[in-house]
């Protein structure tokens, strides 16, 4: 799938605009602070109903405007189109529309418009808390395993019940045992989906990484959130007193993590920032390959400030891998000449100049 048309209104400093992007490569260039990243943010808002720059959406709404709106016409892989729209009012009301109907949740957007983000904060996937790596993992599982979302929802409900009981003691023993059983069943299902996903991801990641950088000995492993040699029911029983003292469940899928190690060390501790960026790029490109295999479609990649921290050799290697995915890519940079020549002649490339929030298409992929 790809975006055929994007309409943006009142997002940060951007002037109202309608974009007709290339189905493949789109380069947004201009000076720092011109609004390039805000275009990526608008697409991110359309696909996930949230910003990657702020946990709050009010700062995304343009000053003195009541609401921001993003509309997109999506070219579906199987043919036909779908119309998506998101609107956020300053007073807090959020509206998601899919083909003229109100959507039940942002998950419906994510399913229609799978997005991958690579930006200067991407190193947090390696350096940040386990929650960030779980989100990365679960994004991938969600897009290849349709049974994952209902299992994840059951897990969250069971966890809320158990944690409430741990803090307040509001459940009788029979009810508590029933919720523990539900938690264990959902946990086993989630763990199976995650293990299968990592098994499929690892060889694709290793192959992709080898085309970007030589890091012999880098390993990717999955920790499920409790002892691999014990059943979760046993772990929960043995840690019950400690869980009550802490007020929450300490073992389970909500504690899962991905571990990247190099020479026996946490990879984030010894890799340079440029190497970390390449590892994250390899992980996200590998996810794109799995989405393509499972859905017969493609991710859309948002790449903010691609040239930063990468020399010409690695920049070209990354462009080549993105091109081989045959997906739609939106890239920002200051100097478009660094990227303009990095593609095959038959690949449609569109150029957009961004200056003080105004976007001008300077090269049309259809020409």
From Swiss-Prot:
Any single biological process term in GO: SOS response
Residues noted as binding ATP in the record, renumbered to the chain: 30-37
UniProt-annotated location(s): Cytoplasm
One cellular component (GO) term of this entry: cytoplasm
Gene Ontology terms for molecular function: ATP binding; single-stranded DNA binding
Pfam family, one: SMC_N
Key word Transmembrane helix present: no
Keyword Transmembrane recorded: no
Record's keyword terms, sorted: ATP-binding, Cytoplasm, DNA damage, DNA repair, DNA replication, DNA-binding, Nucleotide-binding, SOS response
Task performed by this protein: The RecF protein is involved in DNA metabolism; it is required for DNA replication and normal SOS inducibility. RecF binds preferentially to single-stranded, linear DNA. It also seems to bind ATP.
Family according to the record: Belongs to the RecF family.
Listed PANTHER family: DNA REPLICATION AND REPAIR PROTEIN RECF
NCBIfam families in UniProt: recf
Name this polypeptide is given: DNA replication and repair protein RecF
Gene name of the record: recF
